Amino acid sequence: GKRKMVAVLYLKNSWDWSGGYGFYLEHAGMGKAPRPNEDGYPAFMNFVSQYASCQKAHELFYNYVRFILTRTNRYTKKKYKDDPAIMSWQIGNEPRAFSKEALPAFEKWLAEASKLIRSLDKNHLSSIGSEGSWGCENDIQCYERICADKNIDYCNIHLWPYNWSWARPDHLIEDLGVAFKNTK
């Protein structure tokens, strides 16, 4: 608004450091989410893969989406769904299925979430917030399908060359070609 800037706001996070899937699963009665730094990423990923098919967790998220999109900005006095300072909504920061078995339910959930966002807000763009095929268990067809949803306006990809072992921090110049090739 004031500075002629617009924001891309994500509505949830896949990762434990800001709640994410584990938060919703815990509040849906699925038990305590493992903490990656304490319990390891395999335990964390196994637990959060349940999110894709947990309807109670989805409803908690949908209630949050309804609250945020219809909330009134106390400075502009506009509902967020009408606020021109917002460019777009992202369903999440790096949403993932966390297992190949969860992919069908993951795609279904993203379609439901994007439909809800569109039904509440026709003024702003909507996106997934994805890591590309990496967020779809390296299934590029899954990524293409979720991007083709009629309620998704654009797709993005978060790239993590170090995390995905495409480049080594101490050999970046040598590994740049591999990282570049893998982004295509």
How would you name each of these model-derived features?
Residues 1-183:
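Active-site mouth of glycoside hydrolases
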